[in-house]
Regions:
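Thiol/disulfide oxidoreductase modules built on the thioredoxin-like
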Residues: 108-113, 120-164
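Short active-site neighborhood of thiol/selenol oxidoreductases, capturing the structured segment around
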Residues: 48-70
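Short loop/turn microsegments at loop-to-beta-strand junctions
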Residues: 34-35, 57, 134-135
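Structural microenvironment flanking redox-active thiols in thiol-disulfide oxidoreductases
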Residues: 71-110, 121-127
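Sec-dependent N-terminal signal peptides
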Residues: 3-12
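Hydrophobic beta-strand anchors of alpha/beta hydrolase catalytic cores
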Residues: 58-59, 90, 137
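N-terminal "domain-start" segment that seeds a small globular fold
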Residues: 17-49
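Loop/turn elements at helix/coil->beta-strand transitions in domains of secreted/extracellular proteins
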Residues: 54-56, 86-89, 114
Length: 169
């Protein structure tokens, strides 16, 4: 019986620590309350994340000139349609002050089809979240609170990342 309890304890700790192996992820000890998180769609309509309470949200800040953004965008696109994450909403928010034609060309060049581009104009969210660079992804739980941040690029296809993210879904 002791061996069974020890085995379960060890297995639980191994899986609980898997997320620590994912580079560039910062998990907040306490979730941060967010207010007035508003950005624009490609028709300049305002999108407020409070309209998506009850969903797991990823705000991905990026720019067309950013090489790491180019690397991660296809896997982020696939994450949006991952069948294990049915309540996930991904919002790629361009902060490069780039025109919409250039952003649309970027999406076409990288075959991004599962979400639309969004825009932070005039860079209000970049300031609000104190972004230090791109790409940066803000992870928001079902209560509308920031619980983690990805600073830099990651492979959104990573099985450990998806498994960890499912615990918030």
């Amino acid at each position: 019986m002791r061996f069974l309890i020890l085995f379960i304890f060890l297995i639980t700790n191994v899986f609980a620590n898997d997320v620590s192996e994912i580079k560039n992820i910062v998990i907040h000890k306490d979730a941060k309350t967010l207010n007035n998180v508003i950005f624009l769609d490609k028709k300049d309509h305002e999108i407020n994340i409070s309209n998506f309470d009850g969903n797991l949200i990823i705000l991905n800040f990026w720019a067309t000139w950013c090489e790491p953004c180019k690397e991660e965008m296809p896997s982020l696109d696939r994450l949006q349609v991952n069948s294990e994450l049915v309540n996930l909403k991904v919002f790629p928010i361009n902060i490069g002050k780039e025109n919409k034609i250039k952003v649309n060309e970027f999406f076409e060049d990288f075959n991004i089809k599962n979400f639309e581009p969004y825009f932070d104009s005039p860079i209000t969210l970049a300031k609000k979240f104190s972004l230090r660079g791109v790409p940066t992804s803000i992870l928001i739980n079902k209560n509308g609170e920031e619980f983690a941040r990805i600073i830099g690029s990651i492979d959104f296809d990573d099985k450990k990342f998806i498994s960890w993210l499912k615990t918030y879904n």
